[in-house]
């Protein structure tokens, strides 16, 4: 398995690395003229892409290929994939559920790379003085979360594990910022959220975790693109994945320094970022057939629960690099 993953990773970045090496030996303006004007429009959330943007290494390397990079921040995954479907971005990162809803809506997305699983990086939290002790105690209660996000799938799995029906709880669909306000003013009884928002509410409000994703979900992040962009710009995506890999490896080896940097980037207290980083698993991996099988499982669970109006075939979103 390790050899197969290594080969897949090499295929994923090979085109980009080869062209980058060639670019170093030629004048930048000549390459830009030869390649024509190209753009990589990146959507990102609070994660490693934030650091990649701040460091500027991706912009510098892609400039040698005549590629301009633009960045747009999003509060969560679903609006990122809406932007992809609308043709507004080319690349980004989302959790494990948004691609399913995007595929159901006809988005031409491709899973391009993934991170290691991080089930403990999303959780259900309640106020520190709440009488709720288990997820089952939330029967009849109002739960804030982002519709179509990774936390939506966690809600479904928590309901299954507690042997509750969807009608037994009252989802309140809110963005992370609106959910934070609702949680703080007690207009909801619980909040299902991911890091770093999870760590912040623990650190600043003393929120208590009732359940996390351990044993229920994988909770990976996925780097996505459109099929058309992948077919035309394998070199660009190869460089992007290579630079992301460098950033993620650095974060894995320098968590304390990374927490300090992200605290400044995000405007979040450093202890909260450090808490989130203690739960995080950094890295970039190639998408595998096992990955797609798990994503198909998510799609099937949503369909069987009546959340999706039709079945989704995840195989249509397989990356061109899949062996």
Model regions and ranges:
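Short, surface-exposed acidic
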Residues: 68-70, 166-169, 266-277, 309-315
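Short, glycine-/small- and polar/acidic-enriched structural segments
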Residues: 33-165, 172-173, 189-192, 210, ...
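Secondary-structure end/capping motifs
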Residues: 232-307
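Solvent-exposed, polar/charged alpha-helical surfaces in well-ordered, non-transmembrane soluble domains
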Residues: 56, 60, 82, 86, ...
């Amino acid at each position: 398995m390790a050899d197969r993953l290594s080969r897949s990773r090499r295929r994923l970045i090979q085109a980009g690395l080869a062209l980058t090496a060639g670019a170093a030996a030629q004048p930048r303006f000549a390459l830009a003229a030869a390649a024509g004007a190209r753009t990589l429009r990146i959507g990102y959330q609070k994660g490693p892409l934030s650091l990649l943007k701040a460091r500027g290494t991706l912009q510098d390397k892609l400039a040698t290929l005549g590629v301009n990079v633009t960045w747009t921040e999003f509060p969560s995954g679903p609006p990122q994939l809406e932007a992809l479907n609308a043709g507004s971005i080319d690349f980004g990162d989302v959790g494990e559920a948004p691609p399913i809803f995007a595929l159901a809506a006809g988005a031409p997305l491709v899973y391009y790379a993934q991170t290691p699983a991080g089930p403990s990086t999303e959780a259900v939290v309640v106020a520190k003085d709440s009488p709720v002790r288990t997820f089952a105690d939330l029967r009849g209660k109002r739960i804030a979360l982002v519709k179509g996000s990774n936390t939506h799938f966690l809600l479904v799995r928590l309901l299954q594990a507690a042997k509750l029906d969807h009608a037994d709880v009252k989802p309140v669909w809110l963005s992370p910022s609106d959910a934070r306000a609702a949680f703080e003013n007690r207009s909801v009884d619980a909040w299902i959220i991911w890091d770093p928002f999870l760590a912040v509410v623990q650190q600043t409000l003393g929120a208590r975790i009732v359940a996390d994703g351990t044993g229920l979900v994988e909770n990976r992040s996925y780097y996505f693109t459109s099929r058309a962009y992948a077919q035309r710009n394998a070199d660009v995506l190869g460089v992007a994945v290579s630079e992301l890999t460098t950033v993620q490896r650095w974060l894995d080896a320098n968590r304390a320094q990374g927490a300090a940097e992200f605290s400044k980037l995000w405007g979040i207290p450093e202890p909260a970022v450090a808490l989130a980083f203690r739960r995080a698993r950094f890295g970039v991996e190639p998408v595998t057939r096992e990955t797609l099988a798990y994503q198909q499982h998510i799609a099937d669970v949503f369909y069987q629960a009546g959340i999706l109006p039709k079945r989704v075939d995840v195989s249509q979103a397989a990356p061109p690099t899949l062996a």
